[in-house]
Amino acid sequence: AQVVRGITENDGVVLIVGTRPDLRPSIRSAVERLGANGFHVSTERWLPGVLTNASKLLASATQYSVQSQRTQGDLKDESVPNMTQLSTLGYRPDLVIVLNPTENEHAIREATQCHVPTMAIIDTNVDPRSVTYAIPANDDSPRVAELVMGVLSKAGEDGLRRRRAALEAWDKHQRRLQKRRQEPAPLPSDTPS
């Protein structure tokens, strides 16, 4: 939990991978808690290249959304972003959490290839050395996944709260410094002491 807290406190992105339908409710609630710092992959299977070939996958998805908005009349030509710029954007999470690692070995391998730390619920049928942070528990149980995701997402939520508090303290400090700079300097007194 401290890993997730530290990542969200430093404005990191957490990717949650769970490809079984019974895991979707716990994944959705965890992503809602993490807000903009949490994303999920809960399709039927892991799509190869989500991490290693993200620029190509994201470029086509972005182009599709821009094209669909243009056909619906929601998007004007002058507001269309540069497509070459969108295709160079990459997606790289700071942590990948895998809820069912036996079905998502490719996701773990791809994250390892991209040097992204992985965290997974590890049962006796999975090698714990395949992930960076192993959580020893039953990876087949949706209740265990719900419990683990609840703990991890609340830790991430706490990290976001800490980040907000630190940013507010920094902003308050900066405003205080700015106010001191704007105050006129005291005039030296004419009488000797």
Give the positions of each predicted feature.
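Ribosome large-subunit tunnel/peptidyl-transferase-proximal elements
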Residues: A1-E168
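Internal, active-site/partner-interface "lid" segment
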Residues: D158-S193
